[in-house]
Amino acid sequence: MIGFIGAGKAGCSLARYFRKNGGEISGFYSRSDIPEDFIRFDTAEQIVESSDMIFITVSDSAIGAVWRGIDSSAVRGKLIYHISGAESSAVFCGADPDMVCSAHPLLAFSSKETPAEQIKRAFFTLEGGDTAVRAVSALLDRCGNRYAVIKPEVKPLYHAAACFASNLVTAVCAEAEKMLCRCGFAEEDALSALAPLIEENVRNVCEKGIRPSLTGPVSRGDAETVEKHLAVLEGLSRDIYTQLSAVLAEISGHTELLPLLRKKRFQ
């Protein structure tokens, strides 16, 4: 039996997904509303006692407090999980280290009813004790999800990688949107104008890989165009451009552009 503490978007979506794939869900303990098609428990201890696997699906900052609030005698022999990308299984202080695990899905849950097809495509990253990892691996095998096991000491680097591929992409898109507005685009048109470019680039990267998807002046070694860009960029936008272009120069093999990219604005 699988129980959930916390009824947010991720918890509710995963409960439905596991149930759809044959998992038995005991229910939820949560201070917020839970879906009507699940049993509600009045205390954390009650759901722990009624479950073999417990997923604590609260915000990262609340995991430790929720864990400390559960009677330690209730969790003996239970498999305990959280789904944070940033926290390791060490947040479950005092627990049997073999019985705890972080199981992070590389997916942004859009609602409490995230479609099963979306979750099935999610890659899960596991970190924790052998027994807990084996149990959740078996669950994910049944669901058809891919997963990898990492060591706790690389969890911050892992989470930074996830941020690079999601949050920081959003930041780059925001900078591009601002630049188009400076060119005279209406704010409501700027992002929609960029959308096909963004979508096609992400699709190419996912389908073809990094190197085959390279386009633009840096990938061609076009120093003249790069200089024109640098002449009109200032402040944070220029810093972002030069740093990311240096990465592209290394990937594409056009390292002759690096001195130009490292040159100060008015040097």
Specify the residue positions occupied by each region the protein language model found.
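Predominantly flavin-linked oxidoreductase catalytic cores and closely associated redox partners
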Residues: 95, 106-115, 130-132, 211-219
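Rossmann-like NAD(P)(H) cofactor-binding subdomain of soluble oxidoreductases
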Residues: 14, 32-37, 41-115
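Internal alpha-helical scaffold of NAD(P)-dependent oxidoreductase catalytic cores
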Residues: 24, 33, 97, 115-206, ...
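Interdomain hinge/lid region at the active-site interface
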Residues: 201-258, 267
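Amphipathic, non-transmembrane alpha-helical scaffold segments
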Residues: 55, 162-169, 234, 241, ...
